UniProtKB/Swiss-Prot annotation:
Organism: Homo sapiens (Human)
Enzyme Commission code: 1.1.1.-
Record protein name field: C-terminal-binding protein 1
Variant or mutagenesis effect after changing residue 141 to A: Strongly reduces E1A binding
Family: Belongs to the D-isomer specific 2-hydroxyacid dehydrogenase family.
Gene3D superfamilies attached to this UniProt entry: NAD(P)-binding Rossmann-like Domain (3.40.50.720)
Cell location: Cytoplasm; Nucleus
Phenotype for residue 266 to A: Strongly reduces E1A binding
Amino acid sequence: MGSSHLLNKGLPLGVRPPIMNGPLHPRPLVALLDGRDCTVEMPILKDVATVAFCDAQSTQEIHEKVLNEAVGALMYHTITLTREDLEKFKALRIIVRIGSGFDNIDIKSAGDLGIAVCNVPAASVEETADSTLCHILNLYRRATWLHQALREGTRVQSVEQIREVASGAARIRGETLGIIGLGRVGQAVALRAKAFGFNVLFYDPYLSDGVERALGLQRVSTLQDLLFHSDCVTLHCGLNEHNHHLINDFTVKQMRQGAFLVNTARGGLVDEKALAQALKEGRIRGAALDVHESEPFSFSQGPLKDAPNLICTPHAAWYSEQASIEMREEAAREIRRAITGRIPDSLKNCVNKDHLTAATHWASMDPAVVHPELNGAAYRYPPGVVGVAPTGIPAAVEGIVPSAMSLSHGLPPVAHPPHAPSPGQTVKPEADRDHASDQL
């Protein structure tokens, strides 16, 4: 539906037509953009939407049918949607990030185009906090390097050998941990760190006064104060235009000599060239990164490839089986609220409400646009081909398409699952609250 279609309907530019979801209308199409398993989402959406997946590794791999017909999209952090990408979607009304961070979506442009963007702000708080403490403890106690020494055949028996291989290991009690961004994950990290004996400072210009008293923490008023007084600095803020490369050559020089750095938030917060140089010079004693400027991360390239005393993990601090299921369920429920309610009024976690041009019901759409028999199907390249993945498809739709086929060949009929009831219902780092949490 181009702008001419909208004008013919008497709607202003940027306001997308409502989409009907009723017994006489096809179900709206919802697509998982960068994944292939929709078994968690299907039970929540199957009676109100057609669910498909793209398994796209880049926006160029999003199928034309999804671009033309999808009214809802689910996505992880592995692809980025710019304004140019968003303009390719002809019927899209809502995007839900399966996770808390949404810096991979241009939320202002989405709002200008009439597309609501939502997230799951409480996702993986415990997992990310636990992973952060794991990295911090690893830096202090050097477990990774000790393990590596044994794997490499290093003989460790005498006190002198232990002293040599464990060089740099330090006592934790009495050390000062500086937390940048005291949202959900930042607070969870603070409570865990106190149990290990850390003195905890935090810097968060967005947080109202009083939290430090409730949690027994010390608040500092500037980033410079935190960097100067911290033995270990950990980042727990969202990425925005104000804090890109928050840790850079200038701020590294404001840190204590030999401090540690941990980042499980967003890769863009750290200038990796500056970090690599600081590690080589010993200004930073060690660093642990779960997120990187360029992902997927590889040790074989980039500025960190030769950096010493560095631990890297592949953006997995958020993950546990339980957390993954919980965030997917909540993301699907948000899509359901959009379909059965009003955008943005019915949405629980809309992050671009201020940018949306209007709040409208989902309503009518040409019946030919959506194919309800494709619940669970895969929209994958090459263009013009629709297939069903051999795994990850719910039993209700498994095997409905034996192999990939041309769209021009038509689609095999399949019985819909019965309707089911709804399931139960300034360098200023932006902290991980509802509007921007520690990132997944």
